[in-house]
Amino acid sequence: MARGVILLAAGGTGGHLFPAEALAHELNGRGWTVHLATDDRAERFAGHFPAAAVHPIQSATMGSKNPIAVLGAFWKIWRGVRQASTIIGRIKPDAVVGFGGYPTLPPLYAATRRKVPTLIHEQNAVMGRANRALAGRVDAIAGGFLPQDTSAAGEKTVTTGNPVRPAVLEAAKTPYAASTGQEPFRLLVFGGSQGAQFFSDAMPGAIALLSDAQRKRLVITQQARADDVARVKTAYAALGVAVEVSPFFTDMAARMAAAHLVISRSGASTVSEIAVIGRPALLVPYPFALDHDQAANAAALAAAGGGEVHPQSTLSPERIAALIGGLMDNPERLAAMAAGAKSVGRPDAARLLADLTEAIASQKTVSDFKKGTQA
């Protein structure tokens, strides 16, 4: 017999849906029935989502400065609130959990009006706009990197971490082993759909500036946009470097576990996976990210000694070469960075998030939950 119903609200991007999916698996395993509220954009990601039902709900982004567009967005969101309220009345969830993005506004707002217990999960080190709008109304806030401080939001925040994929948990079992002497040095470079262009442009020139001995040690795995793959391969081939370049790697977690150094953007999922697996990283925040969330995520890992943060504007090929070459010649530093990253990894994030969800569903306060976890 099911313990009850939990409604998850996520949408817009797979980045918002992934932690929702991880929580759904955990809650299903505990006997809960899970429903998903999302928008049309995110429905394409939801094909394998472990939910009893998926409920498309209208929403809109509030990004325009055009007053007519703003009014239209408000009207769409309000219609979404009415849709969500009807669904909540029908399925009677014990709690509603949001994962950021504007599609979460209607279901979470409707839930607070109906006095249903509510929780939001923020993946980044700074709150996104939708979660900021909801923070004052919800009962609890779960954070990937958010602080538990004495502010109004901080007092009802529980730092659960960001749930990671099973493949990442498996990769985390591989301890870090520094490359010394003339051993191969495995370098993993990736930037995601928004950031790979910079690495495609900058990395081959930087590798060309390394010493011959250092280039001979390098084994590079680099993610690049499909349009860039051929030219990146050609540039590396001219240097005689062992490299694999592709737009996508299905075994990215295993490749991260095999890496001696990671160079990447600093989205919430990326930083969480680097921390759980425990690998040293040079983080280059995407400079055009909304709310500068990538810079804040990177700073959280750097504060633990797990990585170095380098703004893109400071990274000439000469600077990148100096950073890589210096670390290749300092395995002790790399091992210390790996340990620092591992120290802030949260492999139990899905369990902690499910624990908090159950507590909120049973009408417990965040204060009571924190006391219970510290007992």
Curated annotation (Swiss-Prot):
Its membrane topology: Peripheral membrane protein
An annotated GO cellular component: plasma membrane
Reactions catalysed: di-trans,octa-cis-undecaprenyl diphospho-N-acetyl-alpha-D-muramoyl-L-alanyl-D-glutamyl-meso-2,6-diaminopimeloyl-D-alanyl-D-alanine + UDP-N-acetyl-alpha-D-glucosamine = di-trans,octa-cis-undecaprenyl diphospho-[N-acetyl-alpha-D-glucosaminyl-(1->4)]-N-acetyl-alpha-D-muramoyl-L-alanyl-D-glutamyl-meso-2,6-diaminopimeloyl-D-alanyl-D-alanine + UDP + H(+)
Keyword tags: Cell cycle, Cell division, Cell inner membrane, Cell membrane, Cell shape, Cell wall biogenesis/degradation, Glycosyltransferase, Membrane, Peptidoglycan synthesis, Transferase
Pathway: Cell wall biogenesis; peptidoglycan biosynthesis
Enzyme class label: transferase
Any one GO MF annotation of this record: undecaprenyldiphospho-muramoylpentapeptide beta-N-acetylglucosaminyltransferase activity
CDD domains (UniProt xref): GT28_MurG
One Pfam family cited in the UniProt record for this chain: Glyco_transf_28
Keyword Coiled coil belongs to the record: no
Domain of life from the UniProt record: Bacteria
Keyword match Disulfide bond: no
Biological process, per Gene Ontology: carbohydrate metabolic process; cell division; cell wall organization; lipid glycosylation; peptidoglycan biosynthetic process; regulation of cell shape
Localization in the cell: Cell inner membrane
Residues where UDP-N-acetyl-alpha-D-glucosamine binds: T13, G14, G15, N124, R165, S193, Q294
EC number annotated for this UniProt entry: 2.4.1.227
Biological function: Cell wall formation. Catalyzes the transfer of a GlcNAc subunit on undecaprenyl-pyrophosphoryl-MurNAc-pentapeptide (lipid intermediate I) to form undecaprenyl-pyrophosphoryl-MurNAc-(pentapeptide)GlcNAc (lipid intermediate II).
Family: Belongs to the glycosyltransferase 28 family. MurG subfamily.
Protein's name according to its UniProt entry: UDP-N-acetylglucosamine--N-acetylmuramyl-(pentapeptide) pyrophosphoryl-undecaprenol N-acetylglucosamine transferase
Gene responsible for this protein: murG
